[in-house]
From Swiss-Prot:
Species of origin: Leiothlypis ruficapilla (Nashville warbler)
Keyword terms of this UniProt record: Electron transport, Heme, Iron, Membrane, Metal-binding, Mitochondrion, Mitochondrion inner membrane, Respiratory chain, Transmembrane, Transmembrane helix, Transport, Ubiquinone
Protein's UniProt name: Cytochrome b
One Pfam family in the UniProt entry: Cytochrome_B
Transmembrane segments: 34-54, 78-99, 114-134, 179-199, 227-247, 289-309, 321-341, 348-368
Amino acid sequence: MALNLRKNHQILKIINDALIDLPAPSNISTWWNFGSLLGICLITQIITGLLLAMHYTADTNLAFSSVAHMCRDVQFGWLIRNLHANGASFFFICIYLHIGRGLYYGSYLNKETWNVGVVLLLALMATAFVGYVLPWGQMSFWGATVITNLFSAIPYIGQTLVEWAWGGFSVDNPTLTRFFALHFLLPFVIVGLTLVHLTFLHETGSNNPLGIPSDCDKIPFHPYYTIKDILGFALMLSLLVSLALFAPNLLGDPENFTPANPLVTPPHIKPEWYFLFAYAILRSIPNKLGGVLALAASILVLFLTPLLHTSKLRSMTFRPLSQILFWTLVANVLILTWVGSQPVEHPFIIIGQLASFTYFTIILVLFPLAAALENKLLKL
């Protein structure tokens, strides 16, 4: 009998075990689609990014012009740029929904998978930040100045660290050059981390909406979830293309159409929409070091969620109190996002401070308390 190449070839076997014969729970919902959507986002960003890098010049005198040249003179350059810029937004939409799914259904109890996932989020945020600097518009320049300056809040070594990151005494040509190098490198780091993420996931298998073991009822990944994923790809890519074609600048800052000028500060320096919640937390603390610590904590707090799980039930499916808290947290993050886009004045300051306080309180205090109370109420 001939060997089945798919199951015996060293490389094809790995692909087979990950994408074809992988045993998957029979009841995972559309919330489980975002992992594969993130994979498509990553592939799209790497392809469009590579094409853009072929025409980009990492020099302060030429960067802005090279991007303009791309949009005017390169075949479909405008489309490639719009897909890349808006692809970043879709990447963050997918990762936030993916994390929300993980929090709701208790997926964070796969600790290794979850921790690698948080590192992936940090890598994605770093990539997006250095990428935003490359067009060398006003918001690129001032965003880079403000965010890199935060490192100067670190006691003793802060200022040295910032000047080392800048490659000089301000954001200038060396900064742009190294940010381009980092923006090229980091997506491949993300690819590597993604493989680690999947390796850990396939050790334990996927969680499911009920949060119960599903070993007794598994189905092969192909054809069931391959077709389901392809539907997700089609929907997301059509949304991305629609945004890139009909409203390419909807999510961008008009300030970035002005070339970078160190002598003119924009009236409102703010990051892209996907960083606004963290930016609001940073701004809500009237102390530089405190703000930086809160900013870091807003993401790093995700590492603590597996340790703060007090419920006897894995998922929130049968936990109404935790559900209320979860959706309050979602609303809270949306409020933070909105506040981050507003100027620093009354009433936005106090709203931001209250929302920041609530964000940490829900995650660190109320989730564990509600879960413990639910154990009592359900006599678990």
